[in-house]
Amino acid sequence: MLHRATTTAAAAAAAALLLCPVQALVRPDGVGKLPALGWNSWNAFGCDIDEEKILTAANQIVNLGLKDLGYEYVNIDDCWSVKSGRNATTGRIMPDLTKFPDGISGLAEKIHNLGLKIGIYSSAGWTTCAGYPASLGNETIDAETFAEWGIDYLKYDNCGVPPDWQDQYSYCVPDSGDPATNPNGTCPNLQNPAPAVYDWRTSKTAERYRRMRDALLGVQDKRTILFSLCDWGQADVNEWGAETGNSWRMSGDISPNWPRISTIANLNSFELNSVDFWGHNDPDMLEVGNGNLTLAENRAHFALWAAMKSPLIIGTALDKIDQDHLSILSNKYLLTFHQDPQIGRPAYPYKWGYNPDWTFDPGHPAEYWSGPTSSGDVLVLMLNTESGPANRTAVWSEVPELKGRNNNNNSSSTGFQVTDAWTGSSLGCVQGGYSVELESHDVAVLVVSGEC
């Protein structure tokens, strides 16, 4: 399996992308089969949350047409509970009633009445990342509580881990963005690495997450709760994430700047063999509309996350979003690919462009991507990773899904009907390939259809 970019040979890497994922966590009602679509409070508000902000987001999902496009989860992140501790009598986590005067159950009812679902946050430790009560050792009672409240989604973080639950070995997550620190996707300065034959399924991290998985499955007769693992890519989660949860973080936190987005996209491009129905790599929540990202960078960020079939969890204040950013989040071509009910695999890089193929480069991830759809169309992305404008060309004979789909042996005269996914405009019958001038960090998204 291609893993953590330690392989640079193109043949070995390409073969790895064809491997089947591990046994997945399959739910009888279909929850978690496709990557999640929704909103989360953290990137927009951090700890400064309350019922009004969550309900505003929920109403905006409806009013802006996002619900009609499939966005359904409204997720409360950290800082929702009483920080001083659990209920001394029941042992349950208590919602902070100054922030949520109707409790979480009351808020859940209001969100459900909008035809949406609600998510909540905890951690596989004693405390959350912000120091609030977490769920390690209390998995059963917390799962029961969440089910009783009407929770539909659990984001489960990796903070507050006590010493006796820490892993025996360290794991390499090469997401520093610094090629000197992580040359070719490695961690040469990693302290206490595991032996090559070590099975990370036996790690304490994997066990902490399995405990909550089992607790959630134990209340499944009352409520199905999507399980989103947030262990930052630690403990080789790609190997056991699909059998434990519905999605799993494959890196550290995102931030609203291009170097961080590029770093995460680069790392995830080497780990896409883990993605299929029921299990999805999570490169973290969307930053579309946040920070000082250019419009081009917002487009590239969303297009890559959608093409990789990552969870698309909006992280901006929806009552303040402008039309340009809303249009990106609402792109029907990318969302159709992302939510394809018959094809679970994501788009894969087929050419690196700026670098030789299979180069691990946080500043210049793969630039050419393609993926199939159940309609027979092919999604093609071209990314400009350079710091200035540059031309990019998708040559049809190089796109894996287009090979063999013509009568001219993939000659330069082969033509396909092409649609620009950003404008929705038909580009007509395009012969041989398509060239476009892209601004720095922008992406072209094409839908390639029948021969012509």
Swiss-Prot record:
The UniProt entry, under InterPro entries, shows: Aldolase_TIM, Glyco_hydro_27, Glyco_hydro_27/36_CS, Glyco_hydro_b, Glycoside_hydrolase_SF, Melibiase_C
Where substrate is bound, by residue? 231-235
> What does the UniProt keyword field contain?
Disulfide bond, Glycoprotein, Glycosidase, Hydrolase, Secreted, Signal
A single Gene Ontology molecular function, please?
alpha-galactosidase activity
- Its Enzyme Commission number(s) read 3.2.1.22
The active site of this protein is located at 157, 253
An example of a Gene Ontology cellular component annotation for this protein is: extracellular region
Name the top EC class: hydrolase
Q: Where in the cell is it found?
A: Secreted
**Signal peptide extent:** 1-24
Q: List the disulfide bonds.
A: 47-79, 129-159
Give the reaction(s) catalysed.
Answer: Hydrolysis of terminal, non-reducing alpha-D-galactose residues in alpha-D-galactosides, including galactose oligosaccharides, galactomannans and galactolipids
What CDD domains does the record point to?
Answer: GH27
According to the record, glycans are attached at 87, 138, 184, 292, 391, 409-410
Q: Which domain of life is it from?
A: Eukaryota
Task: Give GO BP annotations, semicolon-separated.
Answer: carbohydrate metabolic process
Question: Any idea what job this protein has?
Answer: Hydrolyzes a variety of simple alpha-D-galactoside as well as more complex molecules such as oligosaccharides and polysaccharides.
Looking up PANTHER family in the UniProt record yields: ALPHA-GALACTOSIDASE B-RELATED, ALPHA-GALACTOSIDASE/ALPHA-N-ACETYLGALACTOSAMINIDASE
Family, according to the entry, reads as follows: Belongs to the glycosyl hydrolase 27 family.
Q: What is this protein called?
A: Probable alpha-galactosidase B
- UniProt organism field: Talaromyces emersonii
